[in-house]
Amino acid sequence: MSIKSDKWIRRMSEEFGMIDPFEPNQIKEADGQRIISYGTSSYGYDIRCANEFKIFTNINSTIVDPKNFDPKNFVTVEDDCCIIPPNSFALARTVEYFRIPRNVLTVCLGKSTYARCGIIVNVTPFEPEWEGYVTLEFSNTTPLPAKIYAGEGVAQVLFFESDEVCETSYKDRNGKYMGQTGVTLPKA
């Protein structure tokens, strides 16, 4: 299994729609202002956060149960940024839609810009033949409110191509998060 380069990421995105919309370069500035970078890097792709957020709330004092998740645990926000309360959590989705080839697995790591502020980004691997918008999980580990910027980079996806095609893909298993179109809450 080997990590894939910028040339491979460009080819797969331009010819096969692996990432849409796709940015072939690393973007570090918009409207004359520095931003948290996104786009193609040497051996990965920096994904952006869309402006759709779900922020945890304790208004309803329900229990967080991954097998029986109550949507009232979240407040929905659509904005240029999201303020995550201290020691709290939010969900968002990527700007980019992904179509992962059958012989590829990805690993996604949060950007150090956010990690250095105490904001942890978690994303599970994109499995072979999974497709959809990626649901992003943000944890604010600080005792202060924390800001996430829509339209800017939040994490880097690394692509690994297997030496052998898998016997059963995510699509073959009818994975429960296949074809996500927005922020997707937990499913059991």
Swiss-Prot record:
Disulfide bonds: none annotated. InterPro entries: dCTP_deaminase, dUTPase-like_sf, dUTPase_trimeric. The gene is dcd. GO terms for molecular function: dCTP deaminase activity; nucleotide binding. Catalyzes the deamination of dCTP to dUTP. This is dCTP deaminase. The lineage of its organism: Bacteria, Pseudomonadati, Pseudomonadota, Betaproteobacteria, Neisseriales. The keyword Hydrolase applies. It holds the Pfam family DCD.
